[in-house]
């Protein structure tokens, strides 16, 4: 059996996450009272129609505060049944959450005539503290549109061929901000930039002319060797410590050339020695 618990602040994308999981064969329950989590898991284990039932539930600030406080104990009870359980926590910065509520004109579940929207969001953060601390995977949706969020959930949660730590090597551009959910970040902006070559400007690190240009630069090769040596040494230690997800982010200025090239090469190297290595280019469209 596989159980995914979806949580996060209101407006961060929990409904989208449940829709993606439902589209991929999960039986989904929105706003499950946290106290019912062990009972739900027990019932799913004896489900007769599915050999490996897939269940996803959302647990958020609509729960009783006393249930949320007990979440660590409840999660421990579920995992004691040897259930493959992931806790996904979605979030966005406060400015983005305020903007989303303004655009949709929906009411925050904790809002009241005597509590502003900003205060409701702050209170929600405190209530969800026990879940935040135990999240296996955190996805910040601040800069993600609906389709990017759907892709991110499918990539991180549904495309794991084998159990164990899931590694994501991701390229990005600093001009659009650092990935806030990255565990390791490498800044490669000091390397020669193909952008300043007119014939390469409109191409990306996936294109052979750009790859050939970067491969011929000694600094690029040295950077690749240093990063790959570090990752090959230390990522197995992350896996040994029972980490469910590890994100490695490689950043250049625009996220089109240097970071893409190095991310591709690093992904190829890591896939030879580690299981569940995925590659993503955040700022390539």
UniProtKB/Swiss-Prot annotation:
Gene3D superfamilies hit by this protein: P-loop containing nucleotide triphosphate hydrolases
Residue stretches spanning the membrane: none
InterPro entries (alphabetical): P-loop_NTPase, RapZ-like, RapZ-like_N, RapZ_C
Positions with a binding annotation for GTP: 60-63
GO molecular function per UniProt: ATP binding; GTP binding
Keywords: ATP-binding, GTP-binding, Nucleotide-binding
Annotated binding of ATP, by residue: 8-15
Homology family: Belongs to the RapZ-like family.
Function as written in the Swiss-Prot or TrEMBL entry: Displays ATPase and GTPase activities.
Name this protein carries in UniProt: Nucleotide-binding protein PFLU_0879
Phylogenetic classification of the source organism: Bacteria, Pseudomonadati, Pseudomonadota, Gammaproteobacteria, Pseudomonadales
């Amino acid at each position: 059996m596989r159980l995914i618990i979806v949580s996060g602040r209101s407006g961060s994308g929990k409904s989208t996450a449940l829709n993606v999981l439902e589209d991929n064969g999960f039986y989904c329950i929105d706003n499950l009272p946290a106290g019912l989590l062990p009972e739900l898991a027990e019932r799913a284990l004896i489900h007769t129609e599915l050999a490996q039932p897939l269940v996803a539930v959302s647990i958020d600030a609509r729960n009783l505060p006393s249930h949320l406080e007990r979440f660590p104990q409840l999660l421990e009870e579920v995992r004691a049944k040897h259930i493959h359980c992931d806790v996904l926590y979605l979030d966005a910065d406060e400015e983005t959450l305020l903007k989303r509520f303004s655009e949709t004109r929906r009411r925050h579940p904790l809002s009241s005539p005597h509590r502003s929207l900003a205060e409701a969001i702050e209170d929600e953060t405190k209530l969800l503290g026990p879940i935040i601390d135990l999240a296996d995977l955190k996805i910040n949706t601040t800069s993600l549109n609906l389709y990017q969020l759907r892709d991110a959930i499918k990539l991180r949660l549904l495309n794991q061929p084998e159990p164990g730590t899931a590694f994501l090597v991701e390229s990005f551009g600093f001009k659009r901000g650092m990935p806030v959910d990255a565990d390791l970040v490498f800044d490669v902006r000091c390397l020669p930039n193909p952008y300043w070559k007119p014939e390469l400007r409109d191409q990306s690190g996936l294109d052979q002319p750009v790859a050939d240009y970067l491969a011929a630069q000694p600094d690029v090769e040295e950077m690749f060797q240093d990063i790959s040596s570090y990752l090959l040494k230390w990522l197995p230690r992350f896996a040994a410590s029972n980490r469910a997800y590890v994100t490695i982010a490689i950043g250049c200025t625009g996220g089109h050339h240097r970071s893409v090239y190095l991310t591709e090469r690093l992904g190829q190297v890591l896939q030879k020695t580690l299981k569940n290595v995925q590659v993503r280019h955040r700022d390539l469209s």
